[in-house]
Structures are given as C-alpha cells and as structure tokens.
C-alpha cells in the first residue's frame, strides 16, 4: 500500500472531521459513544496485531505501511468520540499540540485556527529524534490510552466538563500523533489516506466508474449490450443436476455442473460474471463467450480481453464463492458490511487491469447483488436474469415452469 502523497492544499482538522463524519453509521444511536470508543480500542489492538504478524510472518509490507491504515482507522473513531462529546476539532487539535509542547518542555504556543495536521507534524518535526520513545514504548502508551478510554464508563465521559473532556481526548490524540511519528508517518498523510479509504469504501455519494467500452470508441460488435437477459435452465442428468444458459433462445457456453463431491450450487456461478458486467462494466469471460472482444485495439484485446484476464476473473469468482459458502452465501450482509480484507485482496488481484480503477464499493455491490440472485437461482432451480449496465442492476425472474 503506497502512502498518500502530500497535496498542495493543507488538510485541517475541521475538514477531516466533516468528511470523515459522512461515513458514520452510528449517528443517533444510543450506543454511539460506546461503539466509537470501543472501535478506537479495537483499531489500536489491530495495530498491535499487525506489527506482531509482520515480525512473525516476515511479511513484505513494512511495519509503517501496515500501521498507516490501522492508525487512520483509529483516527476516524477518535474524531467520532470527540464529536459525540461536543469537542470541536480545533479545540481537540489545540489540546493535542499543547500536550506535545508541554511534553517537549516548550511554551505551549498555539497556531491560529483552523488547526491543521501540518501544525501537528510541525511540532513533531521540531523535536524529531528527541522524543525519547521507542516504537515499542509508544505502542504500549497508545494501547494504555485506548484501554483507559474503553474502561471509562460512558456516563462518566458524558458528565465531564467540556474543558476537561477536551484535555483528556487531546492527550489521547497526542499519543496517536506520537505513534505516527514512531512509525515514521506524517499525521497528514495518514489522515488523507483514511479519507481516500472512506471514499473508496463508503462514499457519501455513489458515482459509478465510466464504462470500459464507450460508444464513442467502440462499435456495437465490441460493446456489451447495455441491457440483456440470460436464461438459466437447470436440468437433471442420471447422476447430477446441470445448468445450460440461453441468450435470445440460443444456448451459450458449456453445460455447467457443481464440479464437487458435495452439491453447492456452483453450476450457477456464471451469475457472478453477469454481476461484474452490471456493476463494474467488466467481464473478460463474458466478452469472450459473447464474442465482444475489442479487437480494434490490439493492446486492449491482448491485455484486457485476453486469456490471462479471463483466468483472473474466474479465479476471483471461485475464490469469492468459497469465501461465501461458509457465510451463508452472504445472506443478510448489507452494503458497507462485506469483509474489507476480501475487497482489498480483490483489488490486488486486478492491479494493472482496467477494472482496477473501480472503487471497492462497486465491487461490493457486484458481489452482494450477484449472490442475492445466486440464492434465487438455487431456490427456483433456474430463472432469467436481466443485466442493466446503465442503471447498474440485476433483475431476477423466476421460471414459469420446471424444465427437465
């Protein structure tokens, strides 16, 4: 994971608080404060676990790269706690800077509002190498601070006078900043990277990636139909069920079975390729099956529509299927709740391919919608699925009869 590059604009604490709050799903809940403070504790625990695994398993990512995401997630929860307690972002930043300057035996001089992450980095840089802490010591300090926050009764936190609560959270914020410094991370980079993750996973507004086969570039014979229907027909052989698929009354592809000793419905797995088309505008497998390869562009034809891309897509579909099989095929999982590590792994698998530019929330919609229709196909032993690439939908219609 590449660390976020610094921008020309400076990220202020009020801006971070506003943008990060857009993904807060705990708002107006009676347990909001508990969820946020326990979330902070959990992310610090994940930070410690990531560092431990990096040493034990000799992972290729550096400890700083691993720490950056965990510290970013912890920051999100910490600012959520501050908002819940009515602490303004600038006040939180001032308390953090005052704590750092006092610890460095400096005059607690405060910058003008709005407080920025660059202000905090400036304080850390002014004493670079002089904080007299090791990475291990600082992990212990922030773990202790997170534990104390989790152990303090919710009622006690809410009963604190605002100045006392601000000072208290400011101290925790300073421990977070020192943890960033211990991992040679700039707080502004960590905060920006966290905002990028939020936009990738939980955007305030959904805006789909443009289609990969626009009419302005490709002729009709090289474009997916913007709307089409595939009929899935389950039939029974002497030993096992199999599925055939039809497009406009014409069979396409080979008959599919579960290819497993234990029946699991894999015979309907082509629904996932349809979901990728509907929500991502991508499926090298279906391009090949429907003879829609973009041969007018030899580079695209070779690298994006070729055999390797097809193998990767089939590998993703199979890997996700195996992950879902142990989780009721994602029944009941809502958008925004799918395993984030799963989505990150998919991102790494499609790195270098056109679909790699699609945000993770699009992948999540494709996966969850695909499995929603998959469960209907299993339940109804087939059906018709309509793909709409403009509205980004999959629609299922149950079969009117049971074909044998």
Q: Can you describe what each PLM-predicted range is?
A:
Residues 1-404:
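Flexible "arm" and connector segments at domain edges
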